Regions:
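P-loop (Walker A) phosphate-binding loop of NTP-binding proteins
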Residues: 42
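Conserved glycine(s) of the Walker
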Residues: 46
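A glycine- and Lys/Arg-enriched "phosphate-lid" helix/loop adjacent to the NTP-binding pocket
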Residues: 126-163, 167-170
Length: 190
């Protein structure tokens, strides 16, 4: 809307007509720069690695939701689960996602279970495009991941699959080279 207003003002001031294609190009560019890139997926699907590579490629700040949760709680994710339980962790996670979802132009790597809380969807989607990373179950590491260590991965994936699909705007395979995944996401943003 502001871009259209600027177009009209410029046309009135300069007496030059600006084509709709130019307006659309500017809107896409502004939207591309301001919208957050949100990464979701199973624990170990490569969200952190993809976020770091995307941040470098696009010159954007990378935010790790789990790091912010750990800082807020003053303990590691496994410690939060062991001492306070999953419910406490999920509350902290939703608080962090609410704060980060309001920001602009960041790359946010989420925890694998953020999709289990329906209230997280509007927090992530309000200013972001949600990319779901998929990876072959055999390639998913479980070390340091509390739920992945106590639950069968195939069962966990089956339970979360419909939730990931519901949240995702775009699904990207992360079974190949990191550069290919990054390029696929960059192309989807255009």
């Amino acid at each position: 809307m502001l871009v259209a207003q600027a177009k009209r003002s410029s046309e009135q001031f300069t007496g030059t007509v600006i084509g709709d294609e130019a307006l659309e190009r500017v809107e896409r560019t502004v939207n591309h720069r301001l919208r957050n890139i949100i990464l979701i997926g199973m624990p170990g699907s490569g969200k952190s690695a993809v976020a770091a590579a995307l941040g470098k490629a696009l010159g954007r700040e990378v935010v790790e939701a789990d790091e912010l949760i750990s800082q807020r709680a003053g303990m590691s994710i496994p410690e939060i689960f062991a001492r306070s339980g999953e419910e406490t962790f999920r509350k902290l996670e939703t608080e962090v996602l609410a704060e980060q979802g309001k920001r602009s132009g960041i790359i946010l790597s989420t925890g694998g279970g953020c999709v289990t809380q329906a209230e997280n969807y509007p927090l992530l989607h309000q200013n972001g495009t949600i990319f779901r990373l998929t990876r072959d179950l055999a390639k998913l590491p479980t070390e340091g991941r509390p739920i992945s260590q106590t639950t069968d991965l195939a069962q966990l994936c089956a339970r979360r699959e419909p939730l990931y699909r519901r949240f995702a705007d775009v699904t990207v395979s992360n079974d190949g080279a990191l550069e290919v995944t990054v390029q696929t996401i960059k192309e989807a943003l255009l």
